Structures are given as structure tokens and as C-alpha cells.
């Protein structure tokens, strides 16, 4: 039995490599005046590594990542342009139970992102068995759109034979067109995945300029970077109870002056974020400022404030005032895209 599994696993990997090569040839056969161009939604359970995968595929850090679930709250685009294709990725929040008004709106975003796409990438953690929550998440996929199963984190799977029953179970749940094992964190299998994706896209003209990376305004990126700094420095429930509002944005030739308010639900959360003598807020600010300077390629003066807005995740008026899709004020104007 063991020998049979080893042989099957070997055949699986060999087949994937051969298929990727064939798809590469198929892509390269497209006339250079045309490219394969289309929209690809990235879906999956929380903590499957969707945002890490998006960053790895695009080659830039445009989505926040952390070791906690539900770090992505909105769907947004990352664009990969190669000589053969232009792929517009739509990252989405993790598919999960909608237990708050904010989460219900997030799931509305997911459902919208799974409609009218050229392809869906369903990303799963290859180290985890299929659970009831996974089955429910897969059932949310649109069967009228082709989907590729992406088995992420394979660098953590020592026995690759374990991938076979995982693939089999997922293909029983949904008619996935293909299965591709990758490690987004280790950049393994990404070229193969890009070839697979492009092979399903139609020929067409470029939708965005070749140097275009994301559709998100700089204010959104700043708010997300602050939220990621909170996620990386503060544990437990506090990060998920935060909404970031960029209050002011001033730009000169030498620096950016940015002020943002971190909204939390309880006084205790505010105390945790500020920390002893303001040390935690200072740490969060430093983490965010360094990342912002990397993004903006300029000095950044960042001011952070913490305010209590009780039960904001269930407050429709607050969610409407503070655009829940971007965590920015409704009066904010979009800046030039990076």
C-alpha cells in the first residue's frame, strides 16, 4: 500500500509538472499582440494564506498578512502583468460564519467577488484535514465559474502522499478543474500556478497599464498597514475589534504627514493598545511607519490616536460613515494608486 501511495504521489507531481509545461507552451502560442487577460478571485477559509499568496504572485506586498484569521476585510485587486498575460486578482475575506453585521457585510463582499469572474482560486491549508467548515466554504463557490484548488503551505507537509486524499476529498465536494500544490511563503510552485491560471483566461487587450499593481488608494494602504501593525503586536480579540480611520494626509516633497484614529469597542481594549506609558502605541506606530516609508519611499510622520466606539461592528450608522470596505471615512478622496 505504501509503495502504491508513493507511486501515486510521484505520478501526481510529474503530471502537474507536465501540465504546467504544456500550459506554458499554450500561453506562449498566443500572438504577442494579444495576451491572456482576466479576473481571478482568491477565496478560501480564514488563515489559508490567501493574502500571502496574492503578495507572492504579484511580487509586491499589497495585502496585509498576520498569524491571525480574518485579517482581510474587503476584496481588492492586485495586478500581475507578464509578456504573456495580465491577471487581475481579487483577494477576498476568509469564508466564515457571519456572526456580526461587519462579518455579514464581509461575506456579501465574498459572494460578489465569486460572481462573473474568469476563474476562482480556492486556497486551502494543506496541513489541515477537511472539516465541516471547509465543506460549507466550498459550497459557497459558484459552479458556473471554473475553479482551481490551490493547496498552500506544502512546505510544512513532510509526507506529500497526504496531499492525495486531501485532493480527492475536495474534488468530491466541488468539480475543481485542477489542483496545484504551492507554498506562498517559500515561493514554491508559483510559476506553475501562474501558468495554470493564464491557461484559463481569454485572449484580450490589457485592462490596466503594465506597471499597475493595485486598485487601492494610498489612504487605504496606510490604514491597512496600521491594522497589520496592530495584528502583529497585539494578540487575542483586540485586533479584530479595531477600525482604522485616516483623519489627515499631507504630502510634501520630503515627507508624508499622516494622522489616523484607531477605533475600538471597549475601554479595556484602548488601554491595551496604548500600553504602559504609551509603549504599545509607540511600538505599533514605529512598525507601521517603517512599512509606510518602504511603501511611499519617503519619510513619514505618523500620529496615532485611540478612540472608543462601543459595539461599532454592529452599528449600521458607523459602518456607513466609516466605509467598512476600506476602513476610511466616507469623505475621503482616493489618492493616486501606487
Please give the residue ranges for each predicted region:
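Intrinsic, low-complexity polybasic segments
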Residues: 3-4
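Conserved G1/Walker A P-loop phosphate-binding module
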Residues: 30-108, 112-114
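Residue-level signature of catalytic and energy-coupling elements of molecular machines
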Residues: 43, 47, 53, 76, ...
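Conserved glycine(s) of the Walker
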Residues: 49, 189, 280
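Conserved, well-folded catalytic cores of nucleic-acid-processing
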Residues: 60, 79-83, 98, 113, ...
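Conserved C-terminal guanine-recognition region of P-loop GTPase G domains, centered on the G4
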Residues: 108-177, 252
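Canonical P-loop GTPase G-domain recognition
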Residues: 146, 155-214
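P-loop NTP-binding site
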Residues: 218-338
Amino acid at each position: 500500500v505504501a509503495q502504491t501511495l508513493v507511486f501515486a504521489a510521484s505520478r501526481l507531481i510529474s503530471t502537474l509538472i507536465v501540465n504546467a509545461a504544456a500550459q506554458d507552451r499554450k500561453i506562449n502560442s498566443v500572438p504577442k499582440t494579444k495576451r491572456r487577460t482576466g479576473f481571478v478571485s482568491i477565496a478560501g477559509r480564514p488563515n489559508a494564506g490567501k493574502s500571502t499568496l496574492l503578495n507572492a504572485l504579484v511580487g509586491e506586498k499589497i495585502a496585509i498578512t498576520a498569524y491571525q484569521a480574518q485579517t482581510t476585510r474587503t476584496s481588492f485587486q492586485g495586478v500581475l502583468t507578464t509578456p504573456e498575460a495580465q491577471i487581475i486578482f481579487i483577494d477576498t475575506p476568509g469564508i466564515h460564519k457571519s456572526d456580526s453585521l461587519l462579518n455579514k457585510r464581509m461575506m456579501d463582499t465574498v459572494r460578489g467577488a465569486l460572481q462573473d469572474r474568469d476563474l476562482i482560486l480556492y486556497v486551502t491549508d494543506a496541513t489541515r484535514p477537511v472539516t465541516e467548515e471547509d465543506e460549507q466554504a466550498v459550497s459557497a463557490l459558484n459552479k458556473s465559474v471554473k475553479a482551481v484548488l490551490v493547496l498552500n503551505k506544502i512546505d510544512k507537509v513532510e509526507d506529500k502522499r497526504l496531499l492525495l486524499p486531501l485532493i480527492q476529498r475536495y474534488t468530491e465536494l466541488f468539480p475543481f478543474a485542477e489542483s496545484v500544490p504551492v507554498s506562498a511563503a517559500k515561493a514554491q510552485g508559483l510559476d506553475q500556478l501562474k501558468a495554470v491560471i493564464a491557461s484559463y483566461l481569454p485572449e484580450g487587450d490589457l485592462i490596466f497599464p503594465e506597471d499597475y499593481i493595485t486598485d487601492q488608494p494610498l489612504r487605504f494602504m496606510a490604514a491597512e498597514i496600521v491594522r497589520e501593525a496592530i495584528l502583529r503586536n497585539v494578540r487575542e480579540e483586540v485586533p479584530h475589534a479595531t477600525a482604522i480611520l485616516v483623519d489627515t494626509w499631507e504630502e510634501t516633497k520630503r515627507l508624508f504627514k499622516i494622522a489616523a484614529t484607531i477605533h475600538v469597542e471597549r475601554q479595556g481594549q484602548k488601554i491595551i493598545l496604548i500600553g504602559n506609558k504609551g509603549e504599545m502605541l509607540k511600538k505599533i506606530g514605529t512598525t507601521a511607519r517603517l512599512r509606510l516609508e518602504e511603501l511611499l519611499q519617503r519619510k513619514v510622520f505618523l500620529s496615532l490616536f485611540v478612540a472608543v466606539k462601543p459595539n461599532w461592528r454592529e452599528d449600521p450608522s458607523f459602518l456607513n460613515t466609516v466605509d467598512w470596505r476600506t476602513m476610511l471615512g466616507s469623505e475621503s478622496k482616493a489618492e493616486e494608486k501606487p
